[in-house]
Amino acid sequence: MFLAQEIIRKKRDGQALSDEEIRFFINGIRDNTISEGQIAALAMTIFFHDMSMPERVSLTMAMRDSGTVLDWKSLNLNGPIVDKHSTGGVGDVTSLMLGPMVAACGGYVPMISGRGLGHTGGTLDKLEAIPGFDIFPDDNRFREIIKDVGVAIIGQTSSLAPADKRFYATRDITATVDSIPLITASILAKKLAEGLDALVMDVKVGSGAFMPTYELSAALAEAIVGVANGAGVRTTALLTDMNQVLASSAGNAVEVREAVQFLTGEYRNPRLFDVTMALCVEMLISGKLAADDAEARAKLQAVLDNGKAAEVFGRMVAAQKGPSDFVENYANYLPTAMLSKAVYADTEGFISAMDTRALGMAVVSMGGGRRQASDTIDYSVGFTEMARLGDRVDGQRPLAVIHAKDENSWQEAAKAVKAAIKLDDKAPEITPTVYRRITE
């Protein structure tokens, strides 16, 4: 039997906690036998004293085990259970293509996603732009869709990693969110509860990233790879660029439209293609569906070219109560904004920098995201035809097309876009889409 205050004291004094002590504390968070004050105190001691790798693994596994851990053995699936997690960005619609692409190559992708957070868009919010789409199927239906279609994208239920929800809520109001061991455990507790064989992490770098510097993004990626492999799940991470909007669009319905166009081959933004392919390659190799990069890319290109990936996406939408002909007729189903017109720069020049975070917040301000949990989302608003770093803009080439609910909202968004995009006389050096691959 342990005492919560003694566990806090031990960590306060810089000592390592045992697996048993960590499990006792996390179970107490779940059972409400540990107070909010005690959670806050432990979080702050971890913030200042960090955690060793064994402590990080114990914390993550205890949080995972605080609720249901999915088990797929009874389904006798003929492929690996694989998933991807992104630290979030703007125009990051990779999940909508990646899940169907990997499923079309023989993987099973039980993706449990989140809503928008701060300036970053949420996969669930995007999918809810599709009429009827059900992000909370019951457990049996979720399993059926995975078995029949190969991919489902759903919201987190209260039975998955419940200790994390309470722990995070306390961190949020006690200035202890940005602690690498706590971020790592929070991300992985939910992902490892999916019962995965393999995981790839997409850790963003740059002006629209969650972590403020390249060094901190790399440290987070290394921590996640170390802990997840320590917990028995084959995991790699990619550091990818978020110094500009990843897709050509940012919003909800506009990103779903771009995802369908990507899958059908109607339009593929080159940077979005690079990042999506790189993540899919990691999933195929870690899931043992391909031996190397070349084989993985060939398989992925084939399912794009022969329409199989688009077909899987359509089947997933139908299985989750969306329209059965969504891929063919997406334009008839997705909401459109009242006002859509281009915004132009006040001067000519090359785009040399982009405040991606500010562009994400502009989408939120238009109604495309939430400032508080009770807010309703306007799925139709956002940006399309986003200019990219290095593009030359003038009176002919706009910075973006803004989709807004009215003229006032359009004007505010136009101001935000102009302020977020910096022009120069000469073209900048273009940053890579993938900076680094991190393995155990």
UniProtKB/Swiss-Prot annotation:
GO terms of molecular function: 1,4-alpha-oligoglucan phosphorylase activity; thymidine phosphorylase activity
Catalytic activities: thymidine + phosphate = 2-deoxy-alpha-D-ribose 1-phosphate + thymine
Domain of life: Bacteria
Pfam families: Glycos_trans_3N (PF02885), Glycos_transf_3 (PF00591), PYNP_C (PF07831)
GO biological process, one term: pyrimidine nucleobase metabolic process
Keyword tags: Glycosyltransferase, Transferase
The enzyme's E.C. designation: 2.4.2.4
Keyword Glycoprotein (UniProt): no
EC class: transferase
Annotated signal peptide: none
Keyword field contains Oxidoreductase: no
Pathway note: Pyrimidine metabolism; dTMP biosynthesis via salvage pathway; dTMP from thymine: step 1/2
An example Gene Ontology CC term for this record: cytosol
PROSITE patterns referenced in this protein's UniProt entry, alphabetically: THYMID_PHOSPHORYLASE
Gene3D superfamilies: Nucleoside phosphorylase/phosphoribosyltransferase catalytic domain, Pyrimidine nucleoside phosphorylase-like, C-terminal domain, Transferase, Pyrimidine Nucleoside Phosphorylase, Chain C
HAMAP family: Thymid_phosp
Function: The enzymes which catalyze the reversible phosphorolysis of pyrimidine nucleosides are involved in the degradation of these compounds and in their utilization as carbon and energy sources, or in the rescue of pyrimidine bases for nucleotide synthesis.
NCBIfam families noted in UniProt: PRK05820.1 (NF004490), T_phosphoryl (TIGR02643), Y_phosphoryl (TIGR02644)
Family: Belongs to the thymidine/pyrimidine-nucleoside phosphorylase family.
Self-association and partners: Homodimer.
Listed name of the protein: Thymidine phosphorylase
